[in-house]
Structures are given as C-alpha cells and as structure tokens.
A protein has these predicted regions:
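Metal-dependent amide/peptide-bond hydrolase catalytic core
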Residues: 4, 153-156, 208, 213-215, ...
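Secretory-pathway/membrane protein signature
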Residues: 10-11, 15, 39, 68, ...
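Acidic/histidine-rich catalytic neighborhood of metal-dependent amide-processing enzymes
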Residues: 108, 118-142, 161, 165-217, ...
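Acidic/His- and Gly-rich active-site-bordering loop/insert found
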Residues: 1-114, 147-148, 163
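Hydrophobic/aromatic beta-strand patches that form the interior of the parallel beta-sheet core
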Residues: 72-74, 176, 202-204, 363-365
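Buried hydrophobic packing segments
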Residues: 33, 121-131, 192, 246-249, ...
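Short glycine-rich anion-binding loops that position phosphate/pyrophosphate groups of nucleotides
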Residues: 77-81, 181, 369-370
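Intrinsic disorder/low-complexity segments
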Residues: 58-68, 133-170
Length: 400
C-alpha cells in the first residue's frame, strides 16, 4: 500500500510544483488540493487558503473511537518563496531529463516548493489517507491487520507497519495545510490558530528535516538600528559622525553575552548584516542605519532581547516583528518519548516555521533536506517521500 500512496503523493507533488504558489498567492494551488482531496473522498473545510481535515470526521470512521483521546495536528504549508534567477531548469515545469542530469539522480521531484514544503504536504496527505482507509487505524469495520511492507534499506524507521485496531488508536488527527508561512502572513497559521487551538493537544510541523525530529527551533528577531549624529563639513571637522556612533554600538552589540544558555540550542546568536550611511565624501553623516539579525532561544522573549540591547547602545532600535519566537518540545512529552522509542534522531533547528505560531507541544519533522530550501534547483528524492509516509504512520501508530 505504501508504494501506491507514494506514487499518488509524487503525482500530486508534480502537479503542485506546476502551480505558482508564492506567499499571499496560494488560491490556485489551494483550490487544486481541495479538488484532489474531494476526489479522494476526504471530508475537509477550507478557511481562506488553509485546508483542515479531521480523522474522526471522515466517512466510515467511528468517532467514538477517539472519545477521551488527545488530538495530534499534522501541519505543512502550501506556499513557496520566489524562485532563484539561477535555476538550471524551469522551476515550475522542469525538464525532468535535464533536472536529473543537473542533480545526478532520476529518483527526484524537481522544482520550486518540491522540498519546502510540498514533500511534507503530500506525505502528510498520504498518511491521512492511509489512516482513513480500510487498512487504517480507525475504520468502523476493524479490518484484519495489514502489513505496509518493508522499509527501504538505509531509510530508517520500522521494517513492518501494522495498523492498530480502532481501540488501539492513541490520538485523533487534524491535518492542516496552511498558507502564508514563508512571509509570516496573518491569514495563515497566525490567524488560523485562534480558531483551532482548543482542539489540539500536540503537533508535528512538516518541514524538510530528513525525517529527524527537531525538538527545538530558534526564533528570528530582525532589528533596524539608527544612529543619529549631526551633519557638518568634513574639511572643518564639524558635526557628530553617525558612522562612529554606529560602529561603537556594533562593537558593543556583537560582543554582548546573553547570560541564559539554552540546554538544547546554546547561546542567542547575533550578527550585524547590513549598514548604510553618507550622502557625499565631504559631508559628515547625521544618520547611519544598520540591521541586526538575531536567532533567539527559548530562554528569552524577543521583547526581553530588544530591551536588553537598547539599554547598552545609543542607536535607536526598532524590531520588525516580535512574534517570531523560538520553540522547544516539552521535556518527556509524548512526542519526545515516541521519537526516542522509535530511534528517530533529534536535533535543534536553526530555521523558523509555523511552530512559532502555535502554543501547544510540538516537534518539527518532514521529508527533504533544509539545505535545499530557498535555493536554485530545488528538489526532493522520491525515496524521501516514501520514507516520510512510513515514518509518519509509524509515529502515529506508536505515539505514547
């Protein structure tokens, strides 16, 4: 059954890649996925350009099987970043022979969004379909146990998958396919969470992690800094040089040590990444702007970091967004215990995701590799999708 699910997932992913779905422009791809789900007989609801489906609400599923049990959210995003200008093939309609030559493998789905985050989208959809099928865990007729077959060599996970009986299902499942993730839009998980949060106990955020489980991810705090001086003529040494103020502040900021150290992520990371000043060679600049990129840990709120940095420098600091917080899995949570029991490698992720927009316990885990994201010639291996489906099913069937 896994091979059939994988084939369906790959076909869907190729169709999704062909539909441009930049953040804030997901309507077409959302409509396509809704049509696909409708053809598969799945019950779902569309909220803007987000899609929500619940296992206990599917045809043939006995909702009583989930009474008193927690709910696990599977979440992946359907939007993409803009394509790089350096693609070796068309990012939406790739020549597969050319892409295979560039990448060095025919076992691929190439194109924008294939890896981030289409692979997680289709793998989670395939997992959801499996759970709603007569081979799945919550079917009313309680079918006989059915093996999913062996896992591919070297792909990890269990070698045999056997669905549980209805009585053995440990959690209801809510599948959420979100929009606007790449640009932190208010109509994606940011707004949707307020509607669904009371239904959800814990979550798996689908992002390309090689199916390792991120039990922590750094946040993101971008600060625009402005040093104010007084303009004057350079020949007469007039004025107050804003560049000199900025340089002193930059030295202070980059040498600053945050006291609280995360046991999972280590120190807060801070880098100055842009600087701009001056209008002419003979004018002392009265303004110098620079940008600070900060990757917080769970030890500090973004507000705390901003206040601490403002207290040690003269430049005016303004945060672009204070909501991109860091996240960490609850110690000894069901998610952590299940990952450990299944031998799934855990790590701390340097990148952000929809995890920062929810406030329940979560891990981040999905097929593909983050190192391929937001770059030219994006792709995902087909065997990664197959392994993603297997691992998601295994995780759900064994959640502790």
């Amino acid at each position: 059954m896994i091979k059939a699910l994988t084939n369906d997932a790959v076909s869907l992913l190729k169709d999704m890649v062909a539909i441009p779905s930049l953040s804030f422009n997901e309507d077409q791809v959302c409509s396509f996925i809704c049509k696909w789900m409708d053809e598969k007989g799945l019950a779902f609801r569309r909220v803007g350009n987000n899609i929500i489906a619940r296992l206990s609400e599917q045809a043939g599923i006995d909702p009583k099987a989930f009474e008193g049990k927690p709910t696990l959210m599977l979440c992946a995003h359907i939007d993409t970043v803009s394509p790089s200008n350096e693609y070796s093939f068309d990012p939406y309609n790739p020549d597969y022979a050319k892409a295979a030559e560039v990448i060095g493998s025919e076992d691929i789905v190439p194109g924008l969004g294939s890896n981030d985050d289409g692979a997680s989208v289709v793998s989670m959809l395939a997992t959801f379909i499996y759970l709603t099928s007569s081979s799945g865990a919550g079917f009313k007729n309680n079918p006989s146990q059915a093996s999913l077959g062996p896992s591919p060599c070297g792909q990890g996970g269990s070698t045999v998958f056997k669905p549980s009986s209805t009585a053995a299902v440990n959690a209801d499942i809510i599948l959420v396919l979100s929009c606007e993730e790449e640009r932190s839009g208010v109509n994606g998980m940011t707004g949707l969470w307020h509607e669904i949060k009371d239904e959800i106990d814990f979550a798996i955020i689908g992002e390309p992690t090689l199916m390792k489980a991120a039990t922590a991810e750094r946040g993101l705090l971008v600060i625009d800094a402005t040093a104010h001086g007084v303009s004057g003529h350079a020949a007469r040494n007039e004025g107050v040089n804003a560049i000199e103020i900025a340089l002193k502040d930059i030295t202070t900021l980059t040498s600053h040590e945050f006291d609280r150290i995360s046991p999972r992520m280590g120190k807060v990371n801070l880098n100055v990444t842009q600087i701009n000043a001056g209008t002419a060679h003979n004018v002392i600049p009265d303004k110098c702007t620079f940008v600070i990129d900060i990757r917080p840990t769970e030890q500090y709120t973004n507000e705390e970091i901003l206040a601490q940095l403002q207290s040690i420098c003269k430049s005016e600091l303004k945060a672009r967004n204070l909501s991109n917080r860091s996240s960490a899995t609850v110690t000894d949570s069901p998610l952590q215990k299940t990952a450990e029991a299944l031998g799934i490698e855990t790590f701390s992720s340097p990148t952000t995701s929809d995890w920062m927009r929810i406030d329940c316990d979560a891990i981040k885990m999905g097929p593909g590799d983050s190192s391929r994201s937001h770059k030219k010639d994006e792709f995902v291996y087909i065997h990664e999708i197959e392994n993603g489906i297997r691992t998601y099913i295994d995780f759900i069937n064994n959640i502790l």
